[in-house]
Amino acid sequence: MPQPYIFRTVELDNQSIRTAVRPGKPHLTPLLIFNGIGANLELVFPFIEALDPDLEVIAFDVPGVGGSSTPRHPYRFPGLAKLTARMLDYLDYGQVNVIGVSWGGALAQQFAHDYPERCKKLVLAATAAGAVMVPGKPKVLWMMASPRRYVQPSHVIRIAPTIYGGGFRRDPELAMQHASKVRSGGKMGYYWQLFAGLGWTSIHWLHKIQQPTLVLAGDDDPLIPLINMRLLAWRIPNAQLHIIDDGHLFLITRAEAVAPIIMKFLQQERQRAVMHPRPASGG
């Protein structure tokens, strides 16, 4: 039987952060999810429920999304990574495994880079290195840049095949299910998320990410073409690439197939990812 979620609102820096935790067993390192742009935490529940029920999972709405308050001022990825670390402190988590999806994949890269001792393993799904990337078609990017699909969920039913590809091209029901779970935080929160990634890139420090990393890519992703995930897997030293026969939201549409791949990766016993240099001997 699925574990119930524990919802909490965390107050940090005059910011209300809505969190959801699916409790698990202590023998598995908890998994922290960074969601896509505009996406409230409920949208990843189908993926969470496909994972091992013993795995504790932490999801949250970033500022301006879903049930989290919208900040008065814009933010950038380093500041949001810091806020996430403080949220984990508040919730009493030490080291976690991290998965980032699309926009959340950029934030996951920043978190793994800035807080290596907090991130044991890294999973990057349908994401890129930021400004240094091979973009999707202009029409698709223009649709993505508008918050309309989250402010007006019925809109996503019309554009989902074009922007998400994969199963959304074949099954209209998927778009309806997706739209039914949308909880908009408003246009300003969406624009703050766009601003967070404006001009940002990880390309110059990806080689410093030492965590074991699984890069997951859809082979029919209109938003982030496959070549971008190949670039991530090439630049991150301890990375492996796995290609999924689906589109941008394969984590949801192919949850039952993708979850075992992720669980196998997370449970592999490998050399400790974060190596701390020994102090120099005196003399």
UniProtKB/Swiss-Prot annotation:
Alphabetical keyword list: Hydrolase, Lipid degradation, Lipid metabolism
List of catalytic residues: S102 (charge relay system)
GO CC annotation, single: membrane
Keyword set includes Hydrolase: yes
Keyword Hydrolase: yes
Ranges where the AB hydrolase-1 domain occurs: 30-253
GO biological process: acylglycerol catabolic process
Gene3D superfamilies (alphabetical): alpha/beta hydrolase
Entry EC no(s): 3.1.1.-
Gene Ontology MF terms: monoacylglycerol lipase activity
Taxonomic superkingdom: Bacteria
InterPro entries recorded: AB_hydrolase_1, AB_hydrolase_fold, AB_hydrolase_sf, PHA_depoly_arom
Alphabetical list of Pfam families matching this protein: Abhydrolase_1
Enzyme class, spelled out: hydrolase
NCBIfam families: PHA_depoly_arom
Family: Belongs to the AB hydrolase superfamily. Lipase family.
Function: Complements a mutant that does not degrade PHA; might be a lipase.
Other observations noted: Pseudomonas oleovorans accumulates poly(3-hydroxyalkanoates) after growth on medium chain length hydrocarbons. Large amounts of this polyester are synthesized when cells are grown under nitrogen-limiting conditions. When nitrogen is resupplied in the medium, the accumulated PHA is degraded.
Listed name of the protein: Poly(3-hydroxyalkanoate) depolymerase
Species, as recorded: Ectopseudomonas oleovorans
This protein's encoding gene: phaZ
